[in-house]
């Protein structure tokens, strides 16, 4: 699943994976579960880490951890994003993603389109 950032935010209307900042005392897995509840109204079952990435934008550095996960409960809703989509790895080139996701997208393509 990918989410389109709201137009008024930095990197507005670009696509990304759902997520957000880890709060004090949280693990990365707990943060992902919380963010998905807040942003999509779903509960996740979080699996293994797919990959970690550090990306430097001119205005900030982001540390991304992409997990394998499934929706355990709920139907995704657009609570904070402009749009949400389920896509396959073949559809990745049809979307404009945040630059921080480029390395992750390459790995997804290499892993699932062999």
Language model segments and positions:
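A structural microfeature
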Residues: 2, 48-51
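Generic beta-structure capping elements
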Residues: 3-6, 20, 70, 87-89
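NUDIX/MutT-family hydrolases
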Residues: 68, 77-108
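The catalytic Nudix box helix
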Residues: 17-49, 88
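Active-site-adjacent beta-strand/loop module that shapes the phosphate/pyrophosphate-binding cleft
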Residues: 43, 51-75, 85, 108
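Generic C-terminal helix-cap and adjacent flexible tail
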Residues: 109-114
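N-terminal strand-loop-strand
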Residues: 1-16, 44
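Short, glycine/serine-rich, charged loops/turns that create anion-binding
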Residues: 7, 22, 54
